[in-house]
Amino acid sequence: MRSHYCGDVNKSHVGQEVTLVGWVNRSRDLGGVVFLDLRDREGLVQVVYDPDLPEVFAVASTLRAEFCVQVKGVVRARPDSQVNGQMKTGEIEVLGKALTIINAADPLPLSLDNYQNNSEEQRLKYRYLDLRRPEMAQRLMFRAKVTSAVRRFLDSNGFLDIETPILTKATPEGARDYLVPSRTYKGQFFALPQSPQLFKQLLMMSGFDRYYQIVKCFRDEDLRADRQPEFTQIDIETSFMTSEQVMAKTEEMMRGLFLEMLNVDLGEFPRMTYNEAMRRFGSDKPDLRNPLELVDIADLLKEVEFAVFSAPANDEEGRVAALRIPGGAALSRKQIDDYTKFVGIYGAKGLAWMKINDLNLGLEGIQSPVLKFLNESIVNEIVSRTGAQTGDIILFGADQATVVAESMGALRLKAGEDFSLLQGEWRPLWVVDFPMFEKINGNFHAVHHPFTAPRGVTAAELEANPANRVSDAYDMVLNGCELGGGSVRIHNQEMQSAVFRILGITDDEAKEKFGFLLEALRYGTPPHAGLAFGLDRIIMLMTGASSIRDVMAFPKTTTAACPLTNAPGFANPQQLAELGIAVVEKAVKTEG
């Protein structure tokens, strides 16, 4: 039906007859000549119909936006005065000789030109129309090229693309599972995989030493801009490779991807330990474009008569940190109050501040509601450590260390944006040496997942003292966004059983949920390691999209619904009966 894509016609085709198909982006009648902008996935081309062919001209005059048409005509160069440098095809146009309406279009339920006026609900309900917008089409085509490049790299490095099951068994991986009832085994359920983690480890045990898969994963969790109930991972696993080798290979892949797709050289990825990242930036995925850093000052404040500072300064689990903002002395009291409310979102009880109005005047040049609690030597040391200059402001976080990190880390990012401090376009790094466990309500939880190997300890040593142990785990971070994370895996049964016990998983529960893994670990399991990248997130970053919804063809809403298909929906009584399921209606409270 066509000889060329609309966006591919150029000056080399001048004088040639072409057959094009696509959608009418815009139609206008100017002085008896009809101009069409015809659109397909590759772009737009201008088609001109004049009255010399009355029948064809009459059809052209009836066209409206989004009619699907076939055009036949001759390519000609535009006069210099009419060249459109904003269009890829702006040097040429097609003189129409024939026109077929393949399918007419009703008036659209949303605007494709002024899409900002469309609600998110409208865009998702009529996604097949929203995807016709060039911006959306370009993102999906970019995504296809990225997956192709990833496959080429992994294929050329000896990785095998192997599929793993979608219907599997529920395992505790941090989020709720999507469950699928079994008709054959009444009362029993499959789970949709949160990741192929255990299957890819089993593939290593099977001798397939380099595996990859671009795979759908499912998590029933609260959604944010970078979360969806179903998402896509670039999943990788290797045998007989150390964490350093895995990082080197996947860094090579990511650097090559950015060079091929964006002509960006990411350079070498620096390494930073988890503890350093949390200390300096209050985050395990720091945005290094932002020059602001947290500075510890608790040692200066243990004796001050101001409990807001001295209490956390004397608490082993407390922290007092200072954040200098260049030029921040210009902040109004209302703006400081807004920052105080902002850190309150993250659990902070307040936000002390110190304005450096004139450093040459000593204490006289410093303004702060807490100045009366601090002697001159303490103030001077705070100024020295933070590097504060005249015109700056120093903001203080004082609380439990976790609260300070989260609240001041978030404030660091906000202030960096507010004061336009970000430097450079791309700043990657590896974050390494994560804690093996974290304590929540007195119980140990895996920081990554229960199959992550500790670094440099035996099973007995780990179980005897699990606190403060370091895992052999690594995250790739770019511009404050975690692109992917992985680890060396546990490859012996003794260590895996010890980790389960530390996590409060009884031997019986471990046997019921992970018996197949524990048994597999008895039969010559090789050392193995891997990681998974979030493909949607990578595409979002590379294209500058504001949400992963804008780089997925048919995403869900933030309430995990699909307005297009009205999913999820109710099952009919016969289906429920076959599955042995009864739906319990939610009780409704009545007055009186």
UniProtKB/Swiss-Prot annotation:
The record's section on PANTHER family has:
ASPARTATE--TRNA LIGASE, MITOCHONDRIAL, ASPARTYL/LYSYL-TRNA SYNTHETASE
Tell me where in or outside the cell this protein is found: Cytoplasm
Superkingdom of the source species: Bacteria
What subunit structure does UniProt give?
Homodimer.
Q: Which HAMAP family match?
A: Asp_tRNA_synth_type1 (MF_00044)
Q: Where is this region: Aspartate?
A: 197-200
Q: What class of enzyme is it?
A: ligase
**Positions bound to L-aspartate:** E173, R219, H448, R489
Residue numbers binding ATP: R219, D220, E221, Q228, E482, G534, L535, D536, R537
Can you name a GO cellular component term?
cytoplasm
Q: Which GO terms describe its molecular function?
A: aspartate-tRNA ligase activity; ATP binding; nucleic acid binding
Protein task: Catalyzes the attachment of L-aspartate to tRNA(Asp) in a two-step reaction: L-aspartate is first activated by ATP to form Asp-AMP and then transferred to the acceptor end of tRNA(Asp).
Could you list this entry's UniProt keywords, alphabetically sorted: Aminoacyl-tRNA synthetase, ATP-binding, Cytoplasm, Ligase, Nucleotide-binding, Protein biosynthesis
- Check the record and name the Gene3D superfamilies matching this protein: Bira Bifunctional Protein, Domain 2 (3.30.930.10), GAD-like domain (3.30.1360.30), Nucleic acid-binding proteins (2.40.50.140)
Which organism does this record belong to?
Shewanella sp. (strain W3-18-1)
For this chain, the family text in UniProt reads: Belongs to the class-II aminoacyl-tRNA synthetase family. Type 1 subfamily.
Which catalytic reaction applies to this protein?
tRNA(Asp) + L-aspartate + ATP = L-aspartyl-tRNA(Asp) + AMP + diphosphate
Q: CDD domains given for it?
A: AspRS_core, EcAspRS_like_N
The record's Gene Ontology biological-process terms are: aspartyl-tRNA aminoacylation
What is the protein's name according to its record?
A: Aspartate--tRNA ligase
Q: What is its EC number?
A: 6.1.1.12
